[in-house]
From Swiss-Prot:
Family indicated by similarity: Belongs to the nuclear hormone receptor family. NR1 subfamily.
Span of zinc fingers (NR C4-type): 65-85, 101-120
InterPro entries assigned: NHR-like_dom_sf (IPR035500), NR_DBD_RAR (IPR047159), NR_LBD_RAR (IPR047158), Nucl_hrmn_rcpt_lig-bd (IPR000536), Nuclear_hrmn_rcpt (IPR001723), Retinoic_acid_rcpt (IPR003078), Znf_hrmn_rcpt (IPR001628), Znf_NHR/GATA (IPR013088)
Classification of source organism: Eukaryota, Metazoa, Chordata, Craniata, Vertebrata
Protein name per the record: Retinoic acid receptor gamma-B
Gene: rargb
Length: 489
């Protein structure tokens, strides 16, 4: 058995060996196939999956700012500098700044002290090599890079109603105020060389022309759409408040800068000295200055007419009965002037607000004119023409000749009593109401009354118990002329 086992054992042990070798050989042959498949799969998968982005490069490190040693943001105008010193140098060059050192012109410039002395900071900018030409070239480059936007002017068209309004106002202005080219100019040698307090000859001529101008202004007002629909009281209030504004505006549009003269409606041409001697006095230079300010506006007759209408129809005047109606009439005038002015000057949209600003200037001149009228009344020998007196002077400065009389009527004396005006103010300060204002009601038409009775102010057209007009109420000159001569309806 042992021999059999001994003989059998090697056979049994040997038999599997070839199989294992064969398997190993087969395995060795098969290995490259496996490797190539894996490699092919890996390659195809790499092609399908995108590769991850490469890491960003490290930030670029610049040398500290050559001027203040702060952290640099790059090379600006030739040197490494921070944003602060870059902007400071650019502004200094572009605006041609001139700085002053309050010490010895050798201040230390660093991150902390750089804002203390601009002179030394700019000097150090030049010392470290910043280039002035680089600033200018950079500025020109930006101008070339920026595309110029073509801004087309807005199209302004008047509606049918506004077009009709403009035509009516323009026609009313032209028919009551001839243009300078339509006048035959003539001059006078009266006191043309030196200023005097008052030239009576020029004053007589000027007062005559002013009265005619006032009549033309009333005629102009009547032609404005909607003006005669206002109450008579409001028409008179607006005329008295704006008459001097329109008068000054009209005469200033006839200013000739080459000769420094102004021309009136009949062609009379006066220089600055003659205007002073004719009664303008200290108001002369103010009027001529305003006339010079109108020249750049280059207003035509239509714009002058619209601006005159805006001055006249203004709801902020005192003692108006229906200010809201006046405002309603003014709104289309403002809109018409805005559209007309911008349509006439599409590239100058600021002209309309500049025109409106002249209304404020005119009111200032009118206030000075009313003050001048008071002193002028004391200089002229005779009475002032009634229309001029009514337009230029505040009716409250006139005194009644007597506080009361038997008939109950009080006559108005057309002369200002400055002393009495001071007494009135003193009485108000003491809390005492003067006799002439006792019983006065707020909101009444006291501004248009001319008579007083028993120390009580009465309304101009207030009826008594029998329904008739009270005997003591005399019509003012403006009221009578407005209703009769000019037929204000």
């Amino acid at each position: 058995m042992r021999d059999v086992f001994r003989e059998a054992t090697p056979m049994t042990c040997r038999s599997p060996l070839p199989d294992l070798r064969d398997m190993m050989e087969k395995l060795t042959v098969f290995e490259p196939t496996i490797d190539s498949t894996v490699e092919t799969q890996s390659t195809s998968s790499e092609e399908m999956i995108p590769s991850s982005p490469s890491p960003p490069p490290p930030p670029r490190v610049y040398k500290p700012c050559f001027v203040c040693q702060d952290k640099s943001s790059g090379y600006h105008y030739g040197v490494s500098s921070c944003e602060g010193c870059k902007g400071f140098f650019r502004r200094s060059i572009q605006k041609n700044m001139v700085y002053t050192c309050h010490r010895d012109k050798n201040c230390q410039i660093n991150k902390v002290t750089r804002n203390r002395c601009q002179y030394c900071r700019l000097r150090k900018c030049f010392e470290v090599g910043m280039s002035k030409e680089a600033v200018r070239n950079d500025r020109n480059k930006k101008k070339k890079d920026v595309k110029e936007e073509v801004v087309l002017p807005e199209s302004y068209e008047l509606s049918g109603e506004l077009e009709e309004l403009v035509n009516k106002v323009s026609k009313a202005h032209r028919e009551t105020f001839p243009s300078l080219c339509q006048l035959g100019k003539y001059t006078t040698n009266s006191s043309a060389d030196h200023r005097v307090q008052l030239d009576l000859g020029l004053w007589d001529k000027f007062s005559e022309l002013s009265t005619k101008c006032i009549i033309k202004i009333v005629e102009f007002a009547k032609r404005l759409p909607g003006f005669t629909s206002l109450t008579i009281a409001d028409q008179i209030t607006l005329l008295k408040s704006a008459c001097l504004d329109i008068l000054m505006l009209r005469i200033c549009t006839r200013y000739t800068p080459e000769q420094d003269t102004m021309t009136f409606s009949d062609g009379l041409t006066l220089n600055r000295t003659q205007m002073h001697n004719a009664g303008f006095g200290p108001l002369t230079d103010l009027v001529f200055a305003f006339a010079g300010q109108l020249l750049p506006l280059e207003m035509d007759d239509t714009e002058t007419g619209l601006l005159s209408a805006i001055c006249l129809i203004c709801g902020d005047r005192m003692d108006l009965e229906e200010p809201h109606r006046v405002d309603q009439l003014q709104e289309p005038l403002l809109e018409a002037l805005k559209i007309y002015a911008r349509r006439r000057r599409p590239n100058k949209p600021h002209m309309f607000p500049r025109m409106l600003m002249k209304v404020t200037d005119l009111r200032g001149i009118s206030t000075k004119g009313a003050e001048r009228a008071i002193t002028l009344k004391m200089e002229i020998p005779g009475p002032m023409p009634p229309l001029i007196r009514e337009m230029l002077e505040n009716p409250e400065i006139f005194e009644d000749s007597s506080d009361s009389n038997d008939s109950g009527a009080a006559a108005v004396v057309p002369a200002p009593n400055i002393k009495r005006m001071g007494q009135r103010q003193a009485a108000w300060v003491k809390g005492e109401r003067p006799e002439w204002v006792r019983g006065r009601r707020r909101g009444s038409k006291s501004r248009y009354k001319a008579g007083f009775k028993a120390g009580k102010a009465r309304s101009r057209d207030s009826p008594d118990n029998n329904g008739e007009i009270r005997q003591g109420d005399e019509r003012s000159e403006m009221s009578v002329r407005a209703e009769q001569d000019f037929a204000l309806e």
